[in-house]
Regions:
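Amide-donor transfer/coupling interface in amidating biosynthetic enzymes
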Residues: 3-20, 32-33, 49-50, 54, ...
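Short amphipathic alpha-helix
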Residues: 22-30
Length: 235
């Protein structure tokens, strides 16, 4: 890697062999971005905090796993201790946390991670309102792709203490944080998936093609804005 180049580390939190195109989607967005950054993907089982020293930004991916399982599955929690350590101790390198990554960030700062009593949100698109635009999100009303069972309440005192809550939603009866950023550090955490699935994923009879296309465009812009933020932050 070029020492002067902006470098992004993508941590893949999906179990090996799990069928998903989300990591490939993130990689494609990074490769095609005019921000022209270099990147490396590392599976969470191989991640060590010392790896981030040469990087300008870190992306924590989603997963089919649930952080709420940490409360009774110590073995699972142990697999992510390195990422929890990174989130707690990193003061310099910007972090973009997506869905499961969002929950890792919240958990690292002492928030309660709750699980829906139903089967969760299986890849639907919802519209959310953002209180104010910022470095990543430039519109106040956007469609986003959600696919999760865990959620974080906007009333959580540790979230309110450490994060600026920029978007919440009431989805299938649950109040949840959709977007937050750390009050002092460059940590951006999204409950939703900006790495929206490829065009073939959304069934045309269930989701309007125009909304699906806008969701992909908005998500891609969010990731690209993070890349630009990392580039400027490096300078």
């Amino acid at each position: 890697m070029n020492g002067n180049q902006t470098k992004i580390l993508l941590i893949d939190n999906y179990s090996r062999g799990f069928p998903t195109d989300r990591i490939a989607r993130i990689e494609t967005i990074i490769k095609e971005s005019i921000a022209q950054v270099e990147f490396k993907s590392v599976h969470f089982t191989h991640f060590k905090p010392k790896m981030v020293e040469d990087y300008s930004g870190i992306i924590l991916s989603g997963s089919e796993l649930n952080v709420s399982s940490f409360y009774y599955d110590e073995k699972l929690k142990k697999k992510f201790n390195e990422q929890l350590e990174l989130v707690r101790n990193n003061n310099q390198i910007p972090i973009l946390a997506l869905c499961f990554g969002f929950h890792l960030v919240a958990y690292a700062f002492g928030a309660q991670i709750s699980r829906m009593r139903i089967l969760g949100l299986g890849g639907r698109i919802i519209f959310i309102k953002v209180k104010k635009t910022d470095e990543l999100i430039t519109q106040k009303n956007i469609p986003v792709n959600v696919h999760h069972m865990d959620f974080v309440s906007p009333n959580d005192c540790n979230i309110q203490k450490n994060f600026e809550i920029l978007s919440t939603s009431r989805t299938i009866g649950y109040n949840m944080v959709q977007y937050m950023k750390h009050r002092k550090r460059s940590i951006f955490a999204l409950q939703f998936h900006p790495e929206t699935h490829n065009a073939y994923y959304f069934h045309p009879s269930l989701i309007d093609e125009r909304i699906a296309n806008k969701t992909r465009k908005v998500g891609q812009e969010i990731i690209e804005n993070f890349l630009w933020f990392c580039s400027y932050n490096k300078q």
